Regions:
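OB-fold/S1-family single-stranded nucleic acid-binding modules
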Residues: 194, 233-271
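Glycine-centered structural positions embedded in regular secondary structure
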Residues: 200-201, 222
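Short nucleic-acid-contacting surface segments enriched for D/E, G, S/T with interspersed K/R
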Residues: 173-176, 213-239
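Acidic, low-complexity intrinsically disordered tails
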Residues: 212-221, 255-281
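Append "with occasional cross-activation on large, charged helical scaffolds in nucleic-acid assemblies
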Residues: 1-195, 202, 209, 214, ...
């Protein structure tokens, strides 16, 4: 499949000044620098070059599998560093794949950009009844921008429905305790990926500890002013499911510390009972 897509892209570049390509631009230098600083906390180093190549990120991903920290949590850091692939009427390299020419000519699914490429190739071979532009009534610039936009919309719809279904599922586990791993750190709390289920939830910063936490955006780390406790991506954390909002696809978690009573407090019980009643309305 990859070889066919490369071959088609090369043919397009030989016959047309503009076509339909799948491009992926390199990550910004600042994003790479910040990623390297975070990965060093886990003993992982990106290649010491000014502009890391795709193979350097691939080597880092391999090194991540040797870490005690869950792979998914570290992989997410790399993905956040990357730009999104998109469609373009101008031929540009595909950074993540490491290809100079790439397009979507064939795949397990049939996309509209594939059809545009087919029409262009037929035009080049002299067997197409219509050019890609005439068939769509749009310029290639407009087609590429439109296909990129609708792809983002489809991805967002997929994420939204997945989040709602996960929230609905976790609504059956209110008050239950789970082991998890910190998958994201923000100024307002941490996201925890549960070990038992492929689900992430938010532990609000007010639920972390009896302390005030300072957020280090560069190292993605929270540090307690009084306790000096540090919370970062990859840390293990025991949590309890406190509440869910199915409509918004949100899951609220509460941190369980060793000194905490494992039973549900009256305040938590009251809040959860109230949330359940609200969800039934």
């Amino acid at each position: 499949m990859l070889a066919a897509n490369i071959c088609a892209a090369e043919a397009l570049s030989e016959h047309f000044p503009q076509a339909m390509y799948r491009v992926h631009e390199p990550p910004d230098r600042d994003a790479v620098t910040e990623l390297g600083q975070v990965l060093r906390l886990f003993g992982i180093r990106l290649a010491p070059r000014e502009a890391p190549e795709a193979k350097d990120f691939a080597a880092a991903l391999v090194a991540m599998r040797e870490q005690p920290v869950p792979y998914d949590a570290l992989q997410a850091l790399v993905l956040r560093c990357m730009k999104q692939a998109r469609y373009s009427s101008r031929q540009l390299p595909h950074f993540a794949l490491g290809f100079e020419h790439y397009t979507h000519f064939t795949s397990p699914i049939r996309r509209y950009p594939d059809l545009v490429v087919h029409r262009l190739l037929k035009t080049a071979l002299g067997i197409g009844a219509k050019t890609a532009q005439a068939a769509a009534g749009l310029s290639l610039d407009e087609l590429a921008a439109h296909c990129s936009q609708t792809e983002r919309q489809a991805e967002e719809a997929e994420r939204e429905i997945a989040a709602k279904l996960k929230a609905e599922f976790m609504g059956r586990h209110i008050g239950e305790r789970f082991a998890g791993t910190v998958s994201g750190v923000t100024a307002f709390g941490v996201f925890v990926a549960l070990t038992e289920f492929p689900v992430d939830g938010l532990v609000h910063i007010s639920e972390l500890a009896d302390d005030y936490f300072d957020f280090d955006a560069r190292l993605m780390r929270l540090t307690g002013r009084r306790t000096a406790e540090q919370i970062k991506v990859g840390d293990g954390m025991q949590v309890t499911v406190a509440a869910v909002n199915v409509e918004e696809g949100k899951i609220d978690l509460v941190r369980v510390r060793p000194k905490d009573d494992q039973s549900v407090s009256p305040v938590q019980s009251s809040r959860r009972s109230r949330d359940k009643k609200l969800r039934k309305k």
